[in-house]
Swiss-Prot record:
This is Large ribosomal subunit protein bL33A. GO terms for biological process: translation. One of its GO terms (molecular function) is structural constituent of ribosome. It comes from Synechococcus sp. (strain CC9605). It comes from the Bacteria. It holds the Pfam family Ribosomal_L33. PROSITE patterns: RIBOSOMAL_L33 (PS00582). SUPFAM superfamilies: Zn-binding ribosomal proteins (SSF57829).
Amino acid sequence: MAKNKGVRIVITLECTECRSNPAKRSPGVSRYTTEKNRRNTTERLEIKKFCPHCNKSTIHKEIK
């Protein structure tokens, strides 16, 4: 029998200000990878993390 997948999945977090802000320190979009528990957090994740392109802490949202 095949084993079922675990509850934890790998997600990607992307900076929300990098796309709309043309005056950045460097070109590009900040992305982080992390895991989340599918049972406990069913909605999309939003975490404040440091963006090296904007050079400040910004909100990073989960992307598909």
